[in-house]
């Protein structure tokens, strides 16, 4: 408990010094009221018809409206998000143009990947009801902003994709921005040097509790119990880059396969700023 108190004290002290003071410097700040959205729902078939295999794309993409050409904070945040979520090639585009370009590129790549195989099957007389299911792709992206700890704007992106295989894949991306600068915060910007090991130990404790409850397995009381359940077999516990500075706590996200098998799903662990 002493170690837990110490680490949380370090976290709280660092967070106060990094953010609470920076929010009082009188600079213009971004807030979530400036959020706009781009929505896309499209089904693109391999052929110019309505019966050939198709790629279904659904996008609900949030971005910050720039008040004027000099609104560098909103622009910096938008460009950072576009680079991380859509790809670096979209970084200089207007958000609406970036989403549309991303959609078109995805559809073009789908047709390149699948059309040759589809044409071969049609040429060979394969009945349409016997065509491989993986000829149908699906892509979904949902994003949103939320208010985080004082001076911080949180951003969450949730992606779903099916391109064949035993199951679809999904992953999340969490980001934290300083409202008064638009800077994307990394772990090193938030937590003091030397805190990774004790924080990893604390997260391990939280993981044991979470997995024992989720899997309804009372034998999970230690690292060994986790490993017997297929968790942390290929990596040590670590502090992930996917974290969220929320109002009352800091949360950490482990996507599927990060520390556990696909079947376990996404794992979220939280530590309070104060106890």
How would you name each of these model-derived features?
Residues 1-34:
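Bacterial Sec-dependent N-terminal signal peptides
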Residues 24-275:
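Compositionally biased intrinsically disordered regions enriched in Thr/Gly
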């Amino acid at each position: 408990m002493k170690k837990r108190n110490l680490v949380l004290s370090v976290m709280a002290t660092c967070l106060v010094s990094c953010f609470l003071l920076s929010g009082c410097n009188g600079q213009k700040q971004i807030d979530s009221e400036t959020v706009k959205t781009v929505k896309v729902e499209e089904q693109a078939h391999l052929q110019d018809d309505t019966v050939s295999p198709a790629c279904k794309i659904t996008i609900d993409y949030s971005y910050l409206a720039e008040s004027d050409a000099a609104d560098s904070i909103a622009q910096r945040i938008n460009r950072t998000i576009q680079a991380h979520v859509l790809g670096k090639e979209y970084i200089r585009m207007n958000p609406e143009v970036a989403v549309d370009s991303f959609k078109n590129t995805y559809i073009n790549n789908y047709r390149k990947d699948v059309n040759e195989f589809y044409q071969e099957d049609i040429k060979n007389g394969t009945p349409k009801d016997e065509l491989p299911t993986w000829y149908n792709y699906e892509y979904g992206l949902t994003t949103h902003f939320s208010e985080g700890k004082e001076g911080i704007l949180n951003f969450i992106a949730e992606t779903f994709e099916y391109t064949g295989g035993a199951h679809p894949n999904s992953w999340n991306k969490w980001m934290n921005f300083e409202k008064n600068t638009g800077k994307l915060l990394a772990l090193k910007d938030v937590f003091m040097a030397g805190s990774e090991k004790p924080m990893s130990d604390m997260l391990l404790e939280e993981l044991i509790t979470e997995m024992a409850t989720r899997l309804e397995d009372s034998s999970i009381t230690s690292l060994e119990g986790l490993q017997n359940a297929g968790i942390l077999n290929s990596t040590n516990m670590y502090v992930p880059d996917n974290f969220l500075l929320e109002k009352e706590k800091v949360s950490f996200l482990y996507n599927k396969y990060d520390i556990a098998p696909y079947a376990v799903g996404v794992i979220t662990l939280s530590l309070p700023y104060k106890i």
